[in-house]
UniProtKB/Swiss-Prot annotation:
Subcellular location per the Swiss-Prot or TrEMBL entry: Secreted
Example GO BP: neuropeptide signaling pathway
Secretion signal span: 1-24
Entry similarity comment: Belongs to the 7B2 family.
Gene name of this polypeptide: Scg5
Main location group: secreted
Role noted for this protein: Acts as a molecular chaperone for PCSK2/PC2, preventing its premature activation in the regulated secretory pathway. Binds to inactive PCSK2 in the endoplasmic reticulum and facilitates its transport from there to later compartments of the secretory pathway where it is proteolytically matured and activated. Also required for cleavage of PCSK2 but does not appear to be involved in its folding. Plays a role in regulating pituitary hormone secretion. The C-terminal peptide inhibits PCSK2 in vitro.
Name of the molecule in the record: Neuroendocrine protein 7B2
Modifications made to the protein after synthesis: Proteolytically cleaved in the Golgi by a furin-like convertase to generate bioactive peptides.
Residues annotated with Phosphoserine modification: 139, 203
An annotated GO cellular component: extracellular region
Assembly and binders: Interacts with PCSK2/PC2 early in the secretory pathway. Dissociation occurs at later stages.
Keywords attached to this entry: Chaperone, Cleavage on pair of basic residues, Disulfide bond, Neuropeptide, Phosphoprotein, Secreted, Signal, Sulfation, Transport
Organism classification: Eukaryota, Metazoa, Chordata, Craniata, Vertebrata
Disulfide bridge partners, by residue number: 118-128
C-alpha cells in the first residue's frame, strides 16, 4: 500500500509540474505530451491500482469546445464493440430476424414467389423480379400474390404464381382514362373569392354607376 501511495504521489507531483506555468513554460510543440495523453496515462495507472473511477461525461453544451472533425459511431448493429466506462463489456451482434423468418436461414430456405423487384445492380439471375413496373396497380397485384416464409403454414397456391401470369392479369384489366381537362376549372368564376394577400378584383356588374 505504501508503494502505491508513493507512485501516486510521484505522478501527481509530475502532473502539477507539467501543468503549472510557474515551474516551466514552453510553447506547445509536436513533441510535447498532450493533456489527453497525461489523463490516459493517469487513468491506466489508477486502474491498475484498483482506484480508477468511471470517465467523466461532459454536458452537451460543452460540445462546442471540440476542435476538428468529429464523428459519432456505434449502435447495436455496427459490429463488435466494447461497452462500459472501461470498455470491458463486449456487445452481442444481434441477428436481423423476424417472426416469419427462421433464425437458421440458409440458402435452401429463401423467400417464396413472387420475388422482390430487383434493386440497382441486380438481375433476374439473382432471384429478383426484373423490369417491374413502378405503378400502384402493379404494387397492389404484387402484394395480393405475395407470401412470406412461414414454416407453420402451408400455402397451396404458392407454386402456381409466375411473372407472366401477373403481367397478363394486369394487361387484361381496364386502364384508367387520362383527363386533359380539369372539371373543377369549368363554369363561371367567382370574383368575390380571392387568393390570400392578393388584390381583390370586382366584376363590372358590382361597380356603382357614376
Amino acid at each position: 500500500m505504501t508503494s502505491r501511495m508513493a507512485i501516486l504521489s510521484g505522478l501527481l507531483f509530475w502532473l502539477l509540474l507539467e501543468w503549472n506555468p510557474a515551474f516551466a513554460y514552453s510553447p506547445r510543440t509536436p513533441d510535447r505530451v498532450s493533456e489527453t495523453d497525461i489523463q490516459r496515462l493517469l487513468h491506466g495507472v489508477m486502474e491498475q491500482l484498483g482506484i480508477a473511477r468511471p470517465r467523466v461525461e461532459y454536458p452537451a453544451h460543452q460540445a462546442m469546445n471540440l476542435v476538428g472533425p468529429q464523428s459519432i459511431e456505434g449502435g447495436a448493429h455496427e459490429g463488435l464493440q466494447h461497452l462500459g466506462p472501461f470498455g470491458n463489456i463486449p456487445n452481442i451482434v444481434a441477428e436481423l430476424t423476424g417472426d416469419n423468418i427462421p433464425k437458421d436461414f440458409s440458402e435452401d430456405q429463401g423467400y417464396p414467389d413472387p420475388p422482390n423487384p430487383c434493386p440497382l445492380g441486380k438481375t433476374a439471375d439473382d432471384g429478383c423480379l426484373e423490369n417491374a413496373p413502378d405503378t400502384a396497380e402493379f404494387s397492389r397485384e404484387f402484394q395480393l400474390d405475395q407470401h412470406l416464409f412461414d414454416p407453420e403454414h402451408d400455402y397451396p397456391g404458392l407454386g402456381k404464381w409466375n411473372k407472366k401470369l401477373l403481367y397478363e392479369k394486369m394487361k387484361g384489366g381496364q386502364r384508367r382514362k387520362r383527363r386533359s381537362v380539369n372539371p373543377y376549372l369549368q363554369g363561371k368564376r367567382l370574383d368575390n373569392v380571392v387568393a390570400k394577400k392578393s388584390v381583390p378584383h370586382f366584376s363590372e356588374e358590382e361597380k356603382e354607376p357614376e
